[in-house]
Amino acid sequence: MLDSIHSARWLVQFGEQDIDFLLFPSSPHRRVHPELERLLSGSGAATFRLVPLARYFALPLWVLDKFANNFFRGSLLRQVIRKFKPSIVHALELQNAGYVSLRALSNQKPKSLKLMVTNWGSDIFWFQRFPKHKAKLQQLLQLADAYSAECERDVVLARNLGFTGQAMPVIPNAGGFSEADFAIPLLDPSERKTIALKGYHGWVGKAKVSLEAVREMAEELQGYKIIVYSANRSVLKLAKQISKQTGLEIETFGKGTMSHKQVLEMFAKSKIYVGLSESDGISTSMLEAMAMGAIPVQTSTACCDEWFGDSGVAVHEITVPAVKNAIREALKLAEDPANAEKNLETIKSRASAEMVKKIALTFYD
């Protein structure tokens, strides 16, 4: 997925390794993420190249493959493999890159070629419940030699679907937190008067439930500033309506309008963070909140139990009453600085850039 910051952050870890990367687009976007563009034009030990004409065929072939079960991109990927003879094909994400790899290699996988697939977010946890996707996932996982995921949960799910190969160490797919990230000044918990809400609503995101909980808690939350970030249009509209009705100070940021650093700086002054989703792998926002001292309120579908216990709040049902209770509990947890300190130590020990990179560098051995 050439437009993905997650792809770019994964690849940047290998910039000083003697590896030749040939990038094949799996998403319909002609845009290449700026971070990835820098790799393509860089001069480190690793080389990063796009498959010839990749910027031009990504969209039209994706459209055709919607009706042809990935025939066109699968055929093209097969030709690319025959021409360039890679030692590893690594599918970063399953429903696009993985399924295209399946079409290219099913019944025609060279014995010398290693197929590695990486589960992103909801790739298995959500899609396994749909029969057509489950069948494809089973075929792909039985073909794969190696599998990586962000959650131990998803390793178990892959095994249940027939994967018998090498399970790589569980790490965040997008890399870890740098020294510069950890150097961002953190506001003292007692001085924090901001609540951060992830603003995505649609497919699996449920930001509107968060906002409805805020509406019903308006009296309790007077004095707090609510920041709704990464919000789609309908969420921006609802936030404005609730602010007008309740008098709460609600600041909004549309999807893609905040940089990574700005998001971290927001969490560095937030008392709690609320993120609701029907399905996810690791929630990157949850990790960012934990790194910056904001107590997380996260749906249990995001493997949050693998990252915090009593220093955060897991939401087990996405209803307004449940979210209201979770917000109240998180605000109480935020009163004890030890909870934020515990979360920060978890991030430093499991998600620092140095540690994640050290593990990632073993993937292509």
Where are the language model's segments positioned?
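Nucleotide-activated donor-binding/catalytic signature segment of Leloir-type glycosyltransferases, i.e.
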Residues: K237-T257
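Short hydrophobic beta-strand element within catalytic cores of glycosyltransferases
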Residues: A294-Q298
